[in-house]
């Protein structure tokens, strides 16, 4: 009897997991949602993330699908949004102006840590918003149905 019960519970858990996976990245309104995690100070990663965002946006536009993209930076990845250290600032400005569905988020905890270490707040692009914590933001986005990737 216990074996049957365990098998049934495992089956239900698998069914729930499969159903959840099938809808990841898509909201109930049909909007496709993509979050991109940037936590390393690597120009190649910055460019890959921007390529993914623009390619996803192009694909969604071609099919007529509604979409939202959020690029979340924290730890060393915050350098992507720093006006004094980012090698991709021109691309960020261009994407922000041409693809309004792309949003950039900077981790407030990382900003506070850099401020303490450097003696002044790091200059963050005007195209980014500040969130309390990058990891918490990714968890919130996951709860909202975003598909999260790390290039």
What does each of the following model-derived ranges do?
Residues 1-3, 16:
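Bacterial/eukaryotic Sec-type N-terminal signal peptides
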């Amino acid at each position: 009897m216990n074996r049957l019960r365990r098998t049934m519970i495992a089956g239900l858990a698998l069914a729930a997991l499969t159903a959840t996976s099938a809808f990841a990245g898509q909201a109930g309104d049909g909007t496709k949602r993509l979050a991109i995690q940037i936590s390393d100070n690597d120009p190649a990663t910055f460019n890959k993330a921007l390529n993914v965002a623009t390619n996803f946006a192009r694909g969604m536009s071609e099919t007529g699908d509604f979409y939202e993209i959020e690029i979340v930076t924290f730890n060393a990845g915050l350098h992507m949004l720093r006006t004094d250290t980012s090698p991709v600032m021109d691309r960020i400005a261009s994407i922000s102006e041409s693809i309004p569905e792309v949003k950039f988020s900077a981790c407030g905890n990382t900003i506070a840590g850099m401020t303490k270490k450097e003696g002044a707040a790091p200059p963050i692009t005007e195209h980014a918003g500040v969130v309390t914590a990058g990891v918490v933001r990714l968890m919130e986005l996951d709860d909202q149905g975003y598909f999260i990737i790390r290039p």
